[in-house]
Amino acid sequence: MIKTILPGKTIGIIGGGQLGRMLAMSAKEMGYKIAVLDPSDSCCAKVFSDVFIQAEFNDFESVEKLCSACDVITFEFENIDAASLEKLEKKYNIVQSAEVLRTTQHRYYEKEFARKLDIPTVDYIYVEEDTNVEITKPYLMKTVRFGYDGKGQKKITSTEEVEPHTLLEEFVKLDKEISVVAVKDKNEVIIVAVVENEHKNNILYRSKVPTTATKDQESLAIEYTKRILSNFDYYGVLTVEFFISEGKVIFNEIAPRVHNSGHITMQSATKSQFRAHIEAICGLKVGKIDNKETTLYNILGQDLEYFIDVYKNNGGYLHLYEKEPRQDRKIGHINFYGDVILGGKHD
């Protein structure tokens, strides 16, 4: 049974990036205190923390120090040591379980989990040590661990290119990509938003609500997401990404946390993914969430000046993360009501 953690208590966040920052902002608005652990003394969530611990994520003693100072613990990304988390969750209030981390940290385990729940996936080949795999068509080779924004993956066409500890995924004809942002509270699974996503250079650059998927496709994606959450010991926001290919809904991956596509809910939804997550991990009722037509653009370091001009000339809702601009680094996002197309290099 999940504990009820009321405002005035302390929430610990493992990770001080933009997701941790926006979680902290929502929690502070609700009256919670915040403790953050991150390796960087200049991480963008630090400014919203009451307690800050500078330490590596695999520093068990420091993570336990964070846990001991907090009433509930959450994390902003999944690249945390699951074995350490498993030890800590026996003693502290960690509601995004180590079991979920262990599954979602490994692409093969994740795909197998989906298949066991009768959720369609692309065809794939798991390569452990032996790379002598017959390749008769192109595959997308992905490292089984620690990949994001297209990192750790490449197209291969021959056996000689196969590397150990990878997952080879069959290419499918991609009609569109959608994500289901859901939250599990003490009573039920609530859909925060269903979002359509467009990528450039493997980085999310535009999202929109509602999607152009059919009602049946959205309903199926929602059903699959609820099936996943009902089979996990987990509370909080969890996002599932899907491909729509030739009319079929195909599982891609799970993010056991708040998600980049869910930033759109800061304007689109009656309750943002960040507030919904805080309510859920604190044992509170989230309630029904509705959305209206909204468009999100991610802001990368090289595009900051462009989006500042867009904001000056067109308005919108600008969210900057106080991160140093660098090439392809996410430093903010901007939301607009309606289906907005900026044109030029951004569309």
Place the predicted regions along the sequence by residue.
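Phosphate-binding core of ATP-grasp and ATP-grasp-like enzymes
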Residues: 167-213, 218-251, 255-263, 278-288, ...
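Active-site regions of enzymes building and remodeling cell-envelope glycoconjugates
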Residues: 48-56, 91-95, 168, 315-319, ...
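A conserved helix-loop-beta module that forms one wall/lid of the active-site cleft
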Residues: 96-159
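Peripheral (often C-terminal) accessory segments that flank ATP-dependent C-N-forming ligase machineries
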Residues: 7, 279-347
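Short amphipathic alpha-helix with an adjacent loop that forms part of the alpha/beta core around
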Residues: 60-69, 131-135, 159-161
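Short beta-strand-to-turn element immediately C-terminal to the catalytic PLP-Schiff-base lysine
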Residues: 127, 153-158, 181-185, 210-212, ...
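ATP-binding N-terminal substructure of ATP-dependent carboxylate-amine bond-forming enzymes
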Residues: 1-100, 104-105
